Amino acid sequence: MTIPAFGLGTFRLKDDVVIASVKTALELGYRAVDTAQIYDNEAAVGQAIAESGVPRNELYITTKIWIENLSKDKLIPSLKESLKKLRTDYVDLTLIHWPSPGDAVSVEEFMQALLEAKKQGLTREIGISNFTIPLMEKAIAAVGADHIATNQIELSPYLQNRKVVDWAKAHGIHITSYMTLAYGKALKDEVIARIAVKHNATPVQVILAWAMGEGYSVIPSSTRRENLASNLLAQDLHLDAEDKNAIAALDCNDRLVSPEGLAPAWD
């Protein structure tokens, strides 16, 4: 099973707002939804999916295990709790949201617990998020690269994360990009704007098309129907070599997500 290239993010969306966003997205044809224990919206996402009437087997649902639930005695019970909230017997993908701060729980312990969850049928695939190269090495040592479906990382035109991407690719680990639009900063970029005009597209479509063209999955979020519909069209936009080179030149290692006490030592 391959991870869909395009999905719906739900970070920072809660209650009625996330219910409306998910229901609208599913109506428009989205089939992948990304949530997490710490987003505090799994129950709302579950409600939206249930009310949408879309058959479960058409959906690809991702959740993420929070750092408090990484130990082997907590991980599986916490995932079962997530499943209850999401109103499903299984998720398609479960990620370790952040590596354990200060290595409080070893990579080996939580990866093996996550693999056990997969063996129990609670999740179809497992993966990681915010993992550096040394952490990916440990994760592979714990469960084998074949079991690591993706590394979900911050990745935008301003933070192209080439080192991590190239290493992951060489080891068969797919990349999912979050914060692809750099909190909207990249939408104001002149280079992006020029490419958008050239293709009669929006800056958002250009950035999402660029990321998908690089082989990454994207999970943009929106609360507005027109934006959800417009974002979806990024799948039909194909950039040429000139466009790709222009965006490659925007990389300036501008990282926006690095919570103190949580972030690892970045590559």
Curated annotation (Swiss-Prot):
InterPro entries: AKR, Aldo/ket_reductase_CS, NADP_OxRdtase_dom, NADP_OxRdtase_dom_sf
GO terms, biological process: L-ascorbic acid biosynthetic process; methylglyoxal catabolic process
Documented EC number(s): 1.1.1.-
Pfam families: Aldo_ket_red
PROSITE patterns: ALDOKETO_REDUCTASE_1, ALDOKETO_REDUCTASE_2
Binding-site residues for substrate, renumbered to this chain: 97
Binding site for NADP(+): 179-231
Subcellular location: Cytoplasm
Major localisation: cytoplasm
Keywords: Cytoplasm, NADP, Oxidoreductase
SUPFAM superfamilies with a match to the protein in the record: NAD(P)-linked oxidoreductase
Ribonucleoprotein as UniProt keyword: no
Any one GO MF annotation of this record: aldo-keto reductase (NADPH) activity
Gene Ontology cellular-component annotations: cytoplasm
Reaction equations catalysed: hydroxyacetone + NADP(+) = methylglyoxal + NADPH + H(+)
List of catalytic residues: 39 (proton donor)
Functional note: Aldo-keto reductase that significantly contributes to cellular methylglyoxal detoxification by catalyzing the NADPH-dependent conversion of methylglyoxal to acetol.
Family (UniProt): Belongs to the aldo/keto reductase family.
Subunit structure: Monomer.
Matches recorded under PANTHER family: 2,5-DIKETO-D-GLUCONIC ACID REDUCTASE (PTHR43827), NADP-DEPENDENT OXIDOREDUCTASE DOMAIN-CONTAINING PROTEIN (PTHR43827:SF3)
Protein's name in the database: Methylglyoxal reductase DkgB
Species whose genome carries this gene: Salmonella typhi
